[in-house]
Each structure stands twice: as C-alpha cells, then as structure tokens.
Regions:
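Conserved G/P- and acidic residue-centered "switch" motifs that form tight phosphate/ATP-binding loops
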Residues: 43
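ATP/NTP-dependent adenylation/nucleotidyl-transfer catalytic domains that generate, transfer
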Residues: 2-38, 48, 52-55, 60-63, ...
C-alpha cells in the first residue's frame, strides 16, 4: 500500500453526507442565516464547495458570486457560469477592476515591472514564479518576475526582497477586495460566506489573511487537495474544472499553484503532510513511494518552514490577558 492509498477515501459517500450535515447545521442552527454565498472561481475547490452547499440547502438558498478583474483568466468566469447553470443557482457578477485601480494595485506592480522592462505595455503579461524543478536544486531559490511580450517572448528578471514583498502585498489586495465583496452581499442577504481552502493550503498558509481566509465556514479545511479531487469526481464536477491546473488567478500571465507557491506536486505535498501528521519517518515514505531521498528531504523542509511561518494565519490574534 502506498501513502497515496492512505489518502483515498473509501467511505466517500459518508464523508459527503457529513459535509452536507455540517453546512446545514451551521447555516440553520448555529448562525441562523437564510443561505450561503460562495465565491465561484472556476476552480475545483469552489466548485466542490458550491455543490455541497446546494446538496445541503437546495439551489434557491445558494448564491454564486463571480468576481473577475482585468487580469483574470477569461476561462475562470466561463467555467464558473457553466457550473452555476448546472447547479441551478443564482449568480451575480461583480467586476473588481475599478476598485482595484482605486487601490493602485496594478500601478504599484507595474512601476516595479517597468524598472526592469521599460518596454512593458498593455500588450504584455506577467507573473511571479518560483524556479522550475526546485527540489532538484541545491539551494533555496527566490521567486522571479516573468514577462511575456506581444510576440510571446518570455523575459525573466530577479526581484529584490522589497520588490517581491511590494508586489505580493499589492496582489493580496485582490483577495481582500473579494472578501469585502462577499461580505457585503452576505450581510445584506443574511447569508453565510463559505470558504474553499483545503488542508494542503491551510497547513502551509497558502491563503491571504483576511482575504480568502476571511470566511464564516471552511468545509474543506481538513481535506487534502487529493481528497477534494476525489469528492469532485463523486459529485460529478465538470472535467473542464477538474482537469484545469489550480491557479491563484491573480496575475495576467497564468501561473499554477505549483509554479507560484508550492514548488512540488500535490501528490508530494499531501503524502508528506500526511506523514507529518502521523509521525511517519521520511525514509519510510521515500522507500514506499520510490522517491529520491534528498529531493523529498528538501520538500519536507520547505513544508515545515511554511507551516511554522504561517502559524499566525491559522490562529486568532494574540490578546492581552488582563
């Protein structure tokens, strides 16, 4: 048996029923709200969350909010709309471009970009990316800026720590504006906001504090990403969504979660996180999965470091005990 097998849910129907009960209990009894709002991103996590909400409450009590902006992948909106139609839920589309412009989100990032690449214009696309094959490298490598011009040529530039943090902070505004948009609609309709952060992301802090982490319910929080895919298959989530590479969808040039943050596949992430949880030795995992020990040791260290640095994201703010 491989460690991937341990993450396989043989009782998936029961898990789905329990998730539905969890949602209904919180909406009807704990929070006493009229329904649920889900931010539909066109990705698998939000698709599973929305489908579970419909199964728990019925389609008339679920609202799908679609929040594109000028740098969003057009497929995100297309997939979200088709899913909503399949689920027969009401949707609202709120374009966030003007709000983000008022925060100077695009300008802040583009000022840094133009210092590196003066030829940058509206025909160019860009992203921040971590180096390829990160686990095979001998040292920890810093994320870099990648720009695609109108001729599809790619240019790479190193970023200083200050430049990286500035671009990251500006990008986080996108997630925080999504959160405020969700809560505006939630409060005026007396609906709960349901998040879609999974365990693989939660452990490493791959969410924005008071952004996509700012929600009322997190049904997927204790499910690894590979388990979310199992639920998606059980729920018959469209293949155009399940086959799509997971992405933050916050950069004009598309970048996957693996390329932007993790530096490894979800198979590795989930297997190692499971091993940490169950105190399984690293060497045993490598032998079981036939993985290179040095590469997996580096992956283990990367996950542990992210887990430690993101502790504050999984806890309430410290308070003075008076």
């Amino acid at each position: 048996m491989t460690y991937g097998d341990f993450l396989k849910m043989n009782n998936i129907e029961n898990v789905v029923e329990r998730l539905q009960d969890f949602i209904k209990e919180n909406v009807d009894n704990k929070f006493k709200r009229k329904g649920i709002i889900v931010g539909l991103s066109g990705g698998v996590d939000s698709a599973v969350t929305a489908t579970l909400a419909v199964k728990a409450l019925g389609s008339k009590r679920v609202l799908g909010l679609i929040m594109p902006e000028k740098e969003s992948d057009p497929k995100s909106k297309e997939f979200a709309e088709r899913l909503a139609k399949k689920l027969e839920i009401k949707t609202e589309i709120v374009d966030l471009t003007n709000i983000l412009e008022s925060f100077r989100v695009y300008n802040i990032r583009e000022e840094i970009i133009k210092e590196k690449f003066p030829e940058f214009d509206n025909n160019c696309k860009y992203r921040i990316k971590i180096p390829d094959e990160l686990l095979k490298k001998n040292s920890m490598s810093f994320p870099f800026l990648e720009i695609e011009n109108s001729f599809k040529q790619i240019f790479k530039f190193r970023l200083s720590l200050e430049e990286y943090l500035t671009m990251y902070a500006a990008t986080s505004i996108k997630l925080r504006v999504r959160m405020t948009t969700l809560y505006f609609n939630g409060e005026k309709n007396q609906y709960l906001i349901m998040g879609s952060t999974n365990k693989s992301e939660a452990i490493q802090g791959y969410f924005v504090k008071y952004g996509d982490g700012g929600v009322d319910l997190e049904p997927l929080w204790n499910l690894y990403k590979t388990q979310v895919y199992q639920i998606a298959k059980f729920l018959d989530i469209p293949e155009e969504i399940t086959q799509r590479k997971p992405s933050p969808d916050t950069w004009s040039l598309n970048v996957s979660d693996e390329e932007f943050f993790f530096g490894m596949t979800y198979d590795i992430i989930d297997s190692l996180c499971y091993a940490m949880e169950k105190n399984i030795p690293l060497k045993e995992i490598c032998e079981n999965k036939n993985w290179n020990y040095d590469e997996v040791k580096k992956a283990w260290s990367m996950i542990e470091r992210k887990k430690e640095l993101s502790i504050h994201m999984r806890e309430m703010p410290p308070t003075f005990d008076f």
